């Protein structure tokens, strides 16, 4: 007997789950964001991203396949005419899930799933993290000298650890004040 392989079902059965995911994705496409439980948002994300990928192909066959899944003509029109051209150059990553706290009634973790429609540029590796000057750390470069260890300096120039106060506000007598 075949068993579900995509994790636990959100609703009573697979047919009802497909209907719930279709309705939630239609709301996501019409409103650009949706507040729901965290588990539902995680189940909705791949479902919605596959529909966006299908809409990027365009064409009548893709439109009819998406309509058979969505069952909402307004959401289908929004998906194919407004959303698909904005994400045409991107390969995935069309949605973002943000945790927003807990529901007041039963304490269920809530999340906001939203479409990422602003253009995202490709990352440039390492150019932002490189320093402006290159520091030579080869075998010829010497480490920075430790203060007091230069030739010609006396060892008595540095204060002793047991005579110097640890805290600037602390007195050197180390007496405790009892109140």
Swiss-Prot record:
Domain of life of the native organism: Bacteria
Record-linked InterPro entries: Ribosomal_bL17, Ribosomal_bL17_CS, Ribosomal_bL17_sf
Signal peptide interval: none
Record protein name field: Large ribosomal subunit protein bL17
GO BP field: translation
Subunit structure: Part of the 50S ribosomal subunit. Contacts protein L32.
Pfam families tied to this protein: Ribosomal_L17
GO cellular component: cytosolic large ribosomal subunit
Biased composition (Polar residues): 170-179
Organism of this sequence: Tropheryma whipplei (strain TW08/27)
Compositional bias ranges of the Low complexity kind: 154-168
Keywords attached to this entry: Ribonucleoprotein, Ribosomal protein
Any one GO molecular-function label of the UniProt entry: structural constituent of ribosome
Residue ranges, annotated region (Disordered): 127-179
The family this protein is said to belong to: Belongs to the bacterial ribosomal protein bL17 family.
């Amino acid at each position: 007997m075949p068993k579900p392989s995509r994790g636990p079902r959100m609703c009573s059965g697979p047919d009802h789950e497909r209907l719930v995911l279709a309705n939630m994705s239609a709301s996501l496409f019409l409103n650009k964001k949706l507040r729901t439980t965290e588990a539902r948002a995680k189940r909705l994300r791949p479902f919605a991203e596959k529909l966006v990928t299908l809409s990027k192909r365009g064409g009548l066959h893709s439109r009819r396949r998406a309509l058979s899944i969505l069952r909402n003509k307004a959401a289908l029109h929004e998906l194919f005419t407004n959303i698909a051209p904005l994400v045409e150059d991107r390969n995935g990553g069309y949605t973002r899930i943000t945790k927003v706290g807990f529901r007041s009634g039963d304490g269920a973790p809530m999340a906001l799933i939203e479409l990422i429609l602003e253009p995202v540029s490709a990352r440039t590796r390492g150019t932002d993290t490189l320093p402006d000057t290159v520091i030579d750390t080869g075998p010829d470069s010497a480490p920075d000298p430790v203060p007091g260890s230069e030739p010609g300096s006396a060892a008595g120039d540095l204060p002793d650890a047991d005579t110097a106060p640890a805290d600037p506000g602390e007195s050197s007598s180390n007496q405790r004040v009892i109140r």
